[in-house]
């Protein structure tokens, strides 16, 4: 929790749910999130489309999109946090007003399935968004990131974005970061929401998925000629793969597709872990071999 003497009033934050609606049992977590954000001087404003009403839907695609746009249009809202995940986020893409988003000074935060919205925003507007799940801040594992979140969001620090990496090949990643969840990113293939890959650093991570699934996702990216266009790859965590020790690993699989001269780095701090940090999609990132590995040891 932020020191009350140093607390900065940050205004209001819109809370949306563009993907699957929240189940009833999430009520306590969301109340804890409300209390936490209020406690650091950030007033949360929840859309009416938060909880599941019809199967996993909190509202229609148009309703969920309009609830997001209402926060972009509201001058009292300074930032927007999406607290959902699952499968439904790409439903809202046709109903978003990208001109309004482009002209706003507000940054969208979300993760997992919100990879679709985040990359669509970049593709259509050139604006960056933050790949991060704010609900993690009130979990037992994620509470350790509260100080970093507060310093980054309220005091213009960078703690939440400072990630450790280990290079698998090459010594530096530099460019505009795109991507996120590998499965969800591929939903955009062939649509107007697919980002330009030229010269970009591609972030890939996943919650579920075994070796065959990772192989087919990477193969699709390869068939889209993504690996011929990008300047480098940043691998986040692949939860199911790493938890079960599946082989070959994603680090091994990726080398079948990328040129040996393409820089590839691994971080344990971006992905679905409750204690994950954040990255800005659509913004410049520079990572080099002087970063530390997961054990805190200097690389390179």
Label the model's feature ranges.
Residues 1-76:
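ATP/NTP phosphate-donor binding region
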Residues 202-203, 207-208, 234-243:
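Glycine-rich phosphate/diphosphate-binding loops and the adjacent beta-loop-alpha structural elements
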Residues 237-300:
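ATP/nucleoside-binding phosphotransfer catalytic cores, i.e., glycine-rich phosphate-binding loops
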Residues 57-168, 176:
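Active-site histidine-anchored catalytic micro-motif
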């Amino acid at each position: 929790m932020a020191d009350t003497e140093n607390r900065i009033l940050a205004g209001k934050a819109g809370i949306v749910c563009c993907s699957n609606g929240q189940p009833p049992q999430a009520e306590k977590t969301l109340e804890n999130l409300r209390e936490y954000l209020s406690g650091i001087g950030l007033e949360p404003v929840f859309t009416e489309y938060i909880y599941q009403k019809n199967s996993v839907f909190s509202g229609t695609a148009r309703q969920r999109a309009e609830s997001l746009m209402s926060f972009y249009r509201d001058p009292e809202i300074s930032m927007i946090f999406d607290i959902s995940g699952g499968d439904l986020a790409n439903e809202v893409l046709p109903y978003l007003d990208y001109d309004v988003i482009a002209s706003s000074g507000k940054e969208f935060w979300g993760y997992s399935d919100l990879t679709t919205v985040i990359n669509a925003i970049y593709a259509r507007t050139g604006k960056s968004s933050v790949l991060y799940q704010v609900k993690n801040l009130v979990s037992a594992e994620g509470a350790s990131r509260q100080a970093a979140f507060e310093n980054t969001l309220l005091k213009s620090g960078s703690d939440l974005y400072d990630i450790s990496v280990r290079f698998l090949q090459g010594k530096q990643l530099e460019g505009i970061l795109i991507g996120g969840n590998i499965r969800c990113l591929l939903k955009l293939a062939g649509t107007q929401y697919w980002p330009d890959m030229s010269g970009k650093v591609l972030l890939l991570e996943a919650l579920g998925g075994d070796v065959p699934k990772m192989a087919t996702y990477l193969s699709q990216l390869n068939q889209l000629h993504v690996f011929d266009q990008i300047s480098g790859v940043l691998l986040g965590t692949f939860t199911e793969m790493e938890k079960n020790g599946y082989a070959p690993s994603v680090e091994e699989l990726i080398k079948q597709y990328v040129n040996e001269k393409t820089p590839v780095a691994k971080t344990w701090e971006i992905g679905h872990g409750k204690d994950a940090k954040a990255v800005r999609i659509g913004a410049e990132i520079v990572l080099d071999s002087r970063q530390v590995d997961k054990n805190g040891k200097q690389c390179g």
